[in-house]
């Protein structure tokens, strides 16, 4: 009996969840950053509306007529939603050891992210107002620039996790890398919704 106990296999060491925890912390930090930027934007805009309504000095036209088009911003929103589904597809595929579909889903996710960046650069170019022309234009460039930077980081992260998946580091027993990439990607999708509403809808 004692011999059986002595030769019993050691308990399996639990996997480190460092990548998932780090990604969750990065996502939380990003949400706080954009919440601060949105707060500044809303505060300055409400103050501007107060000045205009009360005919006080300092009020200004927020954006020139037709400077911000609804179609490009809305198209970007739908593109981010589609990318959320492809990212979720990648996670499910790697959990099922369906590597082919995982690679396809990751590739489509990266493609969607690149499309959003392209659309956003087009929207900025189409805006046609220099960054130093007014406070509203500065805020618009700041919000769009911050989002482009974060989305670019998310694309690189998904690409790196995809390369690791190609190397065989992730499977049904260890999908942490793809799940971590999904956390960052879903954060980018969530952040765009208030950005779309503030810039495209309320203008």
Report each predicted region and the residues it spans.
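...captures the hydrophobic TM-helix bundle architecture rather than a specific catalytic motif
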Residues: 1-203
